């Protein structure tokens, strides 16, 4: 009986990539798997066809022979499904593709993988810093309780002079298998808990865990401009890996204290400065604090309460951008609440001045009021 073209079976072009072939086989294997189609000979046959086609096209050498000589080039002239010696071979590729997802092993006698390397857990450290540390950057030392390999047993968990023994229940595989239809499902061994070995003489220092707790000092550079909620990732400073797996990461989560002088708006800083209504009317020069030194700010005549002056590049640096925010000086005009009799008289006289009076006369009166209030 003539055989269908392997590319046709998988529904891919002859120049299909390895990933295309794998995706096509995955789709067909799920669609026609016997467990999904019980008592359906046609579905079982299509499952075998897909497995045989994938077996050839996934292998570069077999595929080259097939492309040149057809089915004769791969030694399969007996019809689909005849290229495998047992059901184990037919299900082997299915296990390769889906095993990591579902824990499936192949049919009877499938491969034992044993315990796999596992990455260590990530750790979180909450760090509170001052506003000035956040603004200028700093280097801080963290004291971290961490699990480290036991120096008594070298991390094996076994007492010195002994070593872990192969688990007799699973034969060192770390897994036991349960049959369900065509599948064997790999389960962690309940005796060794997936380790493949058991410790008969635990290390007295770590009690067989292979790890001990130590306080580790770690120097961390805080970049200038950080804000509450920012995270610093320190690779490899988390919990150690298992079975040779990589260590996890340490995430330092920043919390910035409030400042008595400045308020923060993103990378801009806001500072409030109070002036008298005389200063607001006539203008003045006032000192304004910055992150470095005080600077002098010219207040123009007629300044209103709530007016904001922007000092460029006097704010906080942007992380990773090389730019700096601004300093916003918010003016608050203070109205006196307690006046002497003379001050009150001068204010009333000031209020009676017509708008048509010469400006110099108004300014002269304002200066006179300011002098009376001790603001000159």
UniProtKB/Swiss-Prot annotation:
Keywords, sorted A to Z: Chaperone, Cytoplasm, DNA replication, Metal-binding, Repeat, Stress response, Zinc, Zinc-finger
Any one Gene Ontology cellular component term annotated for this protein: cytoplasm
Location in the cell: Cytoplasm
Residues bound to Zn(2+) 1: 150, 153, 203, 206
Cofactor note text: Binds 2 Zn(2+) ions per monomer.
Cofactor(s) recorded in Swiss-Prot or TrEMBL: Zn(2+)
PANTHER family reported for this sequence: CHAPERONE PROTEIN DNAJ A6, CHLOROPLASTIC, DNAJ HOMOLOG 1, MITOCHONDRIAL-RELATED
Quaternary structure annotation from Swiss-Prot or TrEMBL: Homodimer.
Protein name (record): Chaperone protein DnaJ
Taxonomic source organism: Nitratidesulfovibrio vulgaris (strain ATCC 29579 / DSM 644 / CCUG 34227 / NCIMB 8303 / VKM B-1760 / Hildenborough) (Desulfovibrio vulgaris)
Gene: dnaJ
């Amino acid at each position: 009986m003539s055989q269908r073209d392997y590319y046709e079976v998988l529904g891919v072009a002859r120049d299909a990539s390895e990933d295309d072939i794998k995706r096509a086989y995955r789709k067909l294997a799920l669609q026609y798997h016997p467990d999904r189609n019980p008592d359906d000979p046609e579905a079982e046959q299509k499952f075998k066809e897909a497995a045989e086609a994938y077996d050839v096209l996934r292998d570069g050498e077999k595929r080259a022979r097939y492309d040149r000589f057809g089915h004769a080039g791969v030694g399969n002239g007996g019809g689909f499904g005849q290229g495998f010696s047992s059901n184990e071979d037919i299900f082997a590729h299915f296990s390769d593709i889906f095993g990591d997802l579902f824990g499936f092993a192949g049919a009877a006698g499938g491969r034992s993988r044993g315990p796999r390397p596992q990455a260590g857990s990530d750790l979180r450290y909450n760090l509170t810093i001052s506003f000035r540390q956040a603004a200028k950057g700093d280097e801080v030392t963290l004291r971290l309780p961490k699990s480290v390999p036991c120096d008594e047993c070298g991390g094996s968990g076994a007492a010195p002079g002994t070593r872990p023994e192969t688990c007799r229940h699973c034969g060192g595989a770390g897994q036991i298998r349960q049959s369900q239809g065509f599948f064997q499902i790999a389960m962690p061994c309940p005796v060794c808990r997936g380790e493949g070995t058991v410790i008969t003489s635990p290390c007295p220092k770590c009690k067989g865990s292979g790890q001990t707790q130590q306080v580790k000092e770690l120097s961390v550079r805080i970049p200038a401009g950080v804000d509450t909620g920012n995270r610093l990732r320190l690779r490899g400073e988390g919990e150690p890996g298992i079975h040779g797996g990589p260590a996890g990461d340490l995430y330092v989560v920043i919390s910035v204290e409030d400042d008595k002088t400045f308020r923060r708006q993103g990378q801009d800083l806001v500072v409030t400065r109070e002036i008298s209504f005389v200063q607001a009317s006539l203008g003045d020069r006032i000192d304004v604090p910055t992150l470095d030194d005080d600077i002098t700010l010219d207040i123009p005549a007629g300044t209103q309460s709530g007016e904001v002056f922007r000092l460029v590049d006097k704010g906080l640096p942007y992380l990773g951008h090389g730019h700096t925010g601004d300093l916003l000086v918010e003016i608050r005009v203070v109205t006196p609440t307690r006046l002497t009799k003379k001050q009150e008289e001068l204010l009333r006289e000031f209020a009676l001045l017509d708008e048509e009076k010469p400006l110099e006369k108004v300014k002269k009166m304002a200066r006179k009021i300011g002098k009376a209030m001790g603001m000159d």
